[in-house]
């Protein structure tokens, strides 16, 4: 999984740099109050979550709305995350269990506020982002042909930042956020690193 994630980051970064180099400045057309887009990237588990979960990936869509004379942009997101299980962790906790074929998956529905900094007319613009939402978490595994699963639906928070690149007719962005989900016993924490687009 780390090798796959490394190849993905290098490839996505190269595409982002190439697209930025071809930018011809912002369009003179009137700006719409809304945008749609998508993002994908790596999901890094933290804390107790990282004990049993490998590095993972995520894929999602977004909708943004900018009210006139309001400094923030409102963003709604639907994202799917998937992380593999660490066999060595579960083998240590349950001796004799052998190899487990399973994963952690998560859907999150999030409402965010995005606060940009600097001049919007520039080719690139940093921003802060944060919000709250509903997270549907599920752990699934196959043990000797028997399917085992457990799921929770909990609220969570996220906070982070990124950089938007204004290209000809659309935008790309790089973003890093910290998520904490208020799951039973202990919070589930993770950091997604995302490469995305909006138009």
Language-model segment annotations:
Residues 22-67, 191, 198:
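Short glycine/proline- and aromatic-enriched beta-strand/turn motifs that initiate or cap beta-hairpins
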Residues 24, 60-143, 191-193, 197-199:
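Gram-negative (and chloroplast) outer-membrane scaffold detector with strong preference
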Residues 36-46, 134-135, 172-182:
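Transmembrane beta-strand segments that form the barrel wall of outer-membrane beta-barrel proteins
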Residues 46-49, 94-101, 143-149, 179-183:
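Extracellular loop and loop/strand-boundary signature of outer-membrane beta-barrel proteins
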Residues 111, 128-134, 153-163, 176-178:
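Hydrophobic alpha-helical segments of small multi-pass membrane proteins
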């Amino acid at each position: 999984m780390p090798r796959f994630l490394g190849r993905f980051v290098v490839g996505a970064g190269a595409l982002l740099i190439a697209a930025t180099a071809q930018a011809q400045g912002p369009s003179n057309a009137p700006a719409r109050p809304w945008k749609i887009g998508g993002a994908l990237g790596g999901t890094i588990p933290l804390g107790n979550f990282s004990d049993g979960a490998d590095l993972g990936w995520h894929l999602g869509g977004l909708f943004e709305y900018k009210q006139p004379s309001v400094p923030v942009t409102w963003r709604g997101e639907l994202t799917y995350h998937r992380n593999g299980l660490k066999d060595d962790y579960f083998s240590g906790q349950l001796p004799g269990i052998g190899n487990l074929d399973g994963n952690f998956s998560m859907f999150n529905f999030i409402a965010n506020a995005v606060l940009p900094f600097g001049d919007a007319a520039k080719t690139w613009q940093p921003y802060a982002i944060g919000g709250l939402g509903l997270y549907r978490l599920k752990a699934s595994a196959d043990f000797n042909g028997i399917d085992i699963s457990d799921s929770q639906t909990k609220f969570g928070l996220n906070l982070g930042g990124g950089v938007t690149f204004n290209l000809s007719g659309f935008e790309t962005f790089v973003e890093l956020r910290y998520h904490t989900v208020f799951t039973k016993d202990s919070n589930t924490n993770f950091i997604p690193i995302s490469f995305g687009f909006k138009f």
